[in-house]
Structure formats: C-alpha cells, structure tokens
Amino acid sequence: MGALASHRVSDADFVAAIGVQWQHRPLAPEPGLAALLAQAQLDDGGKATVVQAVGMLVVDECVAHGYHSMDLVVLHPGTPGLDEALERFDKPHTHADDEVRYILEGEGLFGFFDAGGQERVLRVQPGDYLRIPAGVEHRFTLTATRRIKALRLFADTAGWVAQYTQRPAAAMEVPA
C-alpha cells in the first residue's frame, strides 16, 4: 500500500507542476444517487437527476472559474461509436478552455505531458476531480472496464474542441 501512496504523491506533484488540479472528493452515500450511478445506461431524466444532485457539490468551482453549464457523460460498452470516440480522445490534444471532470462511477486513464514531452498516466476513479487548464496537453481512454460516468463543467462548449498536437504517443499503460 505504501508504494501506491507514494506513486500517487509523485503523480500529484507532476500534474500540479503543469497546473492540473487533482483532488479526491468522495461522494457522500446517498441511496438514490448510488442506484442511478450503478445503472449502465441512464435516460435523460436520470442524467438530469445526477447533474442536479452532484452539481450542488461544485457550485463554488463554477463561480470561481466561470463555468456556466454542466452535464453528465456516460460511456459504456454499448455507447454508439465508443471505439471511434476513444480513438479521438486518446490522441494528444489541448483545449481553448478548461476541461473539468468529476468522476462519479467507473474509471479511465488520463495522460498528461509536461513541457519536455514526458507523459504521466493517471488512473481516475470515483471521487476524483480534475481541472485541466486550457492549453495543457493531455489525452484520455477508458480502462478495461470500459465504463465511466463523469460530471463535466464548462464555460463554453466551443472551447472543448480538441486541438491535436500531433505528438506521437504509445498506448497508455495502467499505472501500478
């Protein structure tokens, strides 16, 4: 357990040095919310319920950083076009606006690049909150579970258009 803890500390130092905010904010146990998050798929009403419940927890961040909207992204093996989307997400890129993810269920991998081109891969799991500042080079994929539910915060969806950097990158490896 000690090795994992020290690995996460070094990961935290790496991402902090490039401006990424990475915090662990476990959700308080709430039976109704837990039941929704346990479902593989959610209809629009289910998504709206999750956004309303979890959105209350991030109001301060919305005010502090000018985020005007939020939604819930739900990826699972049955998501139409999942493989094509993951292929796009996995290419190193930046955005004109911050990218904010609050992981509620499932897990994924974010790869972050420093100015020297070194990449650090982080596994994100429920309770992880990431704020990736505009211009930080990164990429994303799902783990073998191929499931994630994440609250997304944004100021302007146009700022989320990926600007691909053309950096060659090997397959992301799951950190130990």
From Swiss-Prot:
Keywords: Amino-acid biosynthesis, Dioxygenase, Iron, Metal-binding, Methionine biosynthesis, Nickel, Oxidoreductase
Site feature Important to generate the dianion, where: R101
Site (May play a role in transmitting local conformational changes) location in chain: D98
Similarity comment: Belongs to the acireductone dioxygenase (ARD) family.
EC number annotated for this UniProt entry: 1.13.11.54, 1.13.11.53
Assembly: Monomer.
Cofactor note: Binds 1 Fe(2+) cation per monomer.
Name listed for the protein in its UniProt record: Acireductone dioxygenase
Pfam families listed in its UniProt record: ARD (PF03079)
Cofactors, names only: Fe(2+); Ni(2+)
Catalysed conversion reaction: 1,2-dihydroxy-5-(methylsulfanyl)pent-1-en-3-one + O2 = 3-(methylsulfanyl)propanoate + CO + formate + 2 H(+); 1,2-dihydroxy-5-(methylsulfanyl)pent-1-en-3-one + O2 = 4-methylsulfanyl-2-oxobutanoate + formate + 2 H(+)
Key word NADP present: no
InterPro entries assigned: ARD, ARD_bac, RmlC-like_jellyroll, RmlC_Cupin_sf
Magnesium found in the keyword field: no
GO molecular function: acireductone dioxygenase (Ni2+-requiring) activity; acireductone dioxygenase [iron(II)-requiring] activity; iron ion binding; nickel cation binding
Task of the protein: Catalyzes 2 different reactions between oxygen and the acireductone 1,2-dihydroxy-3-keto-5-methylthiopentene (DHK-MTPene) depending upon the metal bound in the active site. Fe-containing acireductone dioxygenase (Fe-ARD) produces formate and 2-keto-4-methylthiobutyrate (KMTB), the alpha-ketoacid precursor of methionine in the methionine recycle pathway. Ni-containing acireductone dioxygenase (Ni-ARD) produces methylthiopropionate, carbon monoxide and formate, and does not lie on the methionine recycle pathway.
Gene3D superfamilies for this protein: Jelly Rolls (2.60.120.10)
Name of the gene encoding the protein in the UniProt record: mtnD
Pathway: Amino-acid biosynthesis; L-methionine biosynthesis via salvage pathway; L-methionine from S-methyl-5-thio-alpha-D-ribose 1-phosphate: step 5/6
GO biological process, one term: L-methionine salvage from methylthioadenosine
Binding site for Ni(2+): H93, H95, E99, H138
Residues engaged in binding Fe(2+): H93, H95, E99, H138
